[in-house]
Amino acid sequence: MNLTAYGNENIILNGNPKKTFFRATYNKYTNFGLQRFRIDYEGNRTLNYNSPTEFVFKIPRYAELLHDTYISIQLPDIWSPVKILDTPIQGNILIPYEFKWIEELGAHMIQNIEIFSGGVSLANYPGEYLSCLKERDFSAEKKELWNKMCGNIPELYDPANANGNINVYPNAMYIDQTGVEPSIRGRRLYIPLDAFFCNSSKFSIPLVALQYQEISIKITFNAVSNLYTINDVDNVVDATGLSYRMAPNPNNLDHQMWRFIQPPSDVKASLSSYNQTRNDWNADIHLVGTYIFLGQDERRVLAQNEHKILIKQVLSYDFLGVVGSKIIDIESKDLIVNYMWRFRRSDAFLRNEWSNYTNWAYNNVLPQNITSDLPFNEGVEISNPNTLHITGSMGEYSYNVKDIMLDMGIVMGGVYRENVMEAGVFNLVEKYNRTNGNAKDGLYCYNFCLTTGKDEIQPSGAMNVNRFPYVSFEFNTINAPIDKEGTQVDYICDENGNPIAFRKNVAKLNTYSYDLRVFEERYNVLIISSGRLGLLRAR
């Protein structure tokens, strides 16, 4: 019937056909082979508890090309004990630590990644960029896989609501000598490097053409104390034993990592019952690299010819303590593809809320929730048999305001490149057509290209900003709450010592401020010639 039901309308699809579903052609290709190799660090492969740890990996020449590469690290089993507090009135009170790894663990575990060769820095970007790149460019399915690889899963950051639990944390308590089941099972992370040579085989680094230089990858890890949170066991607010979540205090023995990487050996989990007080574990940090083997003819061509590879480089700029109306200058140059930026509360370090780009103290937790406590009506209590909930009083500051940025404009050479627009333009509209993903709230984008997909080989736009001394971001943020208790106040006195005025550091007027980080992606050309490597334009 399909063949007989044919008319002029079919010309749209079937007129002068160029394609058939019943015959296929293909292009022949040169033979190759893929193989993964483990790349080890020559030295101690453990992480420092209270300071960054640096690893430099020298890339061996196992094959002709280096393609996608991953950072591999083993997380330990976690036993989160329960502190038993003896009180004269209430008796024993159980206070749980409820250890949790931070969200986006794999990305925020890394402070910085640098790829260099012969003194030339090919790539230099913070680990946070990996998380932002995932948010901006990955589909929902790819994000789910990335989250599993990088440890951004409830089993690690919210065990109370994982593995079938519903708001029930799996605390670890000693029962007998057979051992204690961990609160959080250890697992191995595989963190994608996502450098320029990882996304397409066409951009792979031709090691065979680098006869006189070697590639090195330097990875700086954050301190372990920045990677987990616990219940504030020293300031319990109610009979549940729970309090606010906090970053561990490295000077407090109750907060040390060794409390959680070995099982408790008595019911009270007393400090004296632990066998060792080392805060490190066998992290077994190494790289996993995919190498490409080529045939003899293609190997000869790669080794003898000059190579020019168009790459994207990432630069980051930090502006600390911004509140209200501000203009910041970014020293951009060359061909800029896009900007990506976020604001974060300056007190995030108190809670290790590194991936929280909102005004809320805790990610996805409303500061002031609804309540069933009704106000009095002319001194008479209002009955509430149906347990209705109300929003409550706003007070002097609305802590429930979520978004930090209100609006922004982009200025180049004193001229508006983009007029001041509401934050939603950069938070929603810009992402709708220009990105493949659905970046979370608080991660803003502005593109000079048509699409930002990291797998896109063909450039789709950029802007040469060399005519301008700098690019300016003009923006407004919400106001942070005022610090009523005040900090240091300087009094201005006359010649007789009588106070006539006072002044206060503007940066300390608020209980916290906001830290702005801007990621810039720009084009550059990697040149490999005569066995050596360089960049067309220095960073």
Placement of each model-derived feature along the sequence:
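Short, low-complexity Pro/Thr/Gly
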Residues: M1-R539
